[in-house]
């Protein structure tokens, strides 16, 4: 059967065109074109202030994802902590199916739980409080009513504050909480978990299940996970 591919944490922006080029190369590759599905598990973009923002970056990415979708490859998207405001309009434009925070897939007979990963970092209490606020539907609606220029400035300010806070936070609280993660996997009756967010690419075998962490994309490196009947493996971009 055809494989599925998983990516996350590309953090695309105009400042890093090399990352956009890496993604476009992957989407145009023979491997992606022959896939059963491609799953984007959040933080496709470095920030997102609304589907009404039109830029060359957003348009080119949506165009290439749509081309892949038109070939018969199912493309699914889970919102991340940077692009949680991506809505149905952009997903429709790109030919992507928007998934909830948690979904369970039957991947070659293995029940697999997928998510972005930020909700698993339960030791970071300050972030979870912030997340609850920005995920309030009423506040999101009010934010999206602001002029685009204001939203962009506010998003930039929030990113600066977040970057400064990360520099002083203990590294362990920014990783997943092992006990909570194991409970989530059991609650969804899964035997494998795939997530991103922490940027700590690795395949863990723990607590009776497999936890696969997708890495972030940086410089000329793309973290791409291929899952097929033989299992799950990270593949370099040149093999795609």
From Swiss-Prot:
User: What's its membrane topology?
Assistant: Peripheral membrane protein
Q: Which GO terms describe its biological process?
A: lipid A biosynthetic process
Q: Which reaction does it catalyse?
A: UDP-2-N,3-O-bis[(3R)-3-hydroxytetradecanoyl]-alpha-D-glucosamine + H2O = 2-N,3-O-bis[(3R)-3-hydroxytetradecanoyl]-alpha-D-glucosaminyl 1-phosphate + UMP + 2 H(+)
- Record flagged with keyword rRNA-binding: no
Question: Could you say which residues bind Mn(2+) 1 here?
Answer: 9, 11, 43, 199
Subcellular localization(s) per the UniProt record:
Cell inner membrane
What is the predominant subcellular site recorded for this chain? membrane
Keyword Acetylation set for record: no
Which cofactors, if any, are listed as required? Mn(2+)
Binding-site positions, Mn(2+) 2: 43, 81, 116, 197
- Main function: Hydrolyzes the pyrophosphate bond of UDP-2,3-diacylglucosamine to yield 2,3-diacylglucosamine 1-phosphate (lipid X) and UMP by catalyzing the attack of water at the alpha-P atom. Involved in the biosynthesis of lipid A, a phosphorylated glycolipid that anchors the lipopolysaccharide to the outer membrane of the cell.
Q: Which domain of life is it from?
A: Bacteria
**What detail does the entry give on cofactor binding?**
Binds 2 Mn(2+) ions per subunit in a binuclear metal center.
Task: Supply the enzyme class, top level.
Answer: hydrolase
Assigned EC number: 3.6.1.54
Per UniProt, the keywords (alphabetical) are: Cell inner membrane, Cell membrane, Hydrolase, Lipid A biosynthesis, Lipid biosynthesis, Lipid metabolism, Manganese, Membrane, Metal-binding
From which source organism is this entry?
A: Neisseria gonorrhoeae (strain ATCC 700825 / FA 1090)
**Which Pfam families does this chain map to?**
Metallophos (PF00149)
Q: Which GO terms describe its cellular component?
A: cytoplasm; extrinsic component of plasma membrane
State the family it belongs to: Belongs to the LpxH family.
Which pathway does the protein contribute to?
Glycolipid biosynthesis; lipid IV(A) biosynthesis; lipid IV(A) from (3R)-3-hydroxytetradecanoyl-[acyl-carrier-protein] and UDP-N-acetyl-alpha-D-glucosamine: step 4/6
Q: Which PANTHER family match?
A: UDP-2,3-DIACYLGLUCOSAMINE HYDROLASE, UDP-2,3-DIACYLGLUCOSAMINE HYDROLASE-RELATED
Protein name listed in UniProt: UDP-2,3-diacylglucosamine hydrolase
Q: Which GO terms describe its molecular function?
A: manganese ion binding; UDP-2,3-diacylglucosamine hydrolase activity
Which residues are recorded as binding substrate? 81-82, 124, 162, 166, 169, 197
InterPro entries, alphabetically?
Calcineurin-like_PHP_ApaH, LpxH-like, Metallo-depent_PP-like, UDP-diacylglucosamine_Hdrlase
């Amino acid at each position: 059967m055809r494989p599925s591919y998983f990516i996350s944490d590309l953090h695309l922006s105009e400042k890093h065109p090399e990352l956009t080029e890496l993604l476009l190369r992957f989407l145009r590759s023979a491997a992606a074109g022959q896939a059963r599905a491609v799953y984007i598990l959040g933080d496709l973009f470095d920030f997102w202030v609304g589907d009404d923002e039109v830029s060359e970056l957003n348009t080119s990415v949506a165009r290439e994802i749509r081309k892949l979708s038109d070939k018969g490859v199912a493309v699914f998207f889970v919102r991340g902590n940077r692009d949680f405001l991506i809505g149905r309009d952009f997903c429709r434009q790109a030919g992507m199916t928007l998934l909830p925070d948690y979904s369970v897939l039957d991947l070659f007979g293995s029940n697999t739980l997928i998510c972005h990963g930020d909700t698993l970092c339960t030791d970071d209490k300050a972030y979870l409080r912030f997340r609850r606020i920005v995920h309030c539907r009423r506040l999101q609606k009010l934010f999206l009513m602001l002029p685009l220029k204001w939203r962009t400035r506010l998003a930039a300010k929030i990113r600066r504050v977040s970057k400064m806070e990360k520099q002083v936070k203990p590294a362990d609280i920014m990783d997943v909480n092992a006990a909570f993660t194991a409970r989530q996997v059991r609650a969804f009756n899964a035997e494998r978990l795939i997530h991103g967010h922490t940027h700590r690419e690795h395949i863990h075998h723990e607590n009776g299940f497999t936890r696969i962490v997708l890495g972030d994309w940086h410089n000329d490196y793309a973290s791409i996970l291929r899952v097929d009947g033989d299992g799950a493996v990270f593949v370099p971009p040149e093999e795609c």
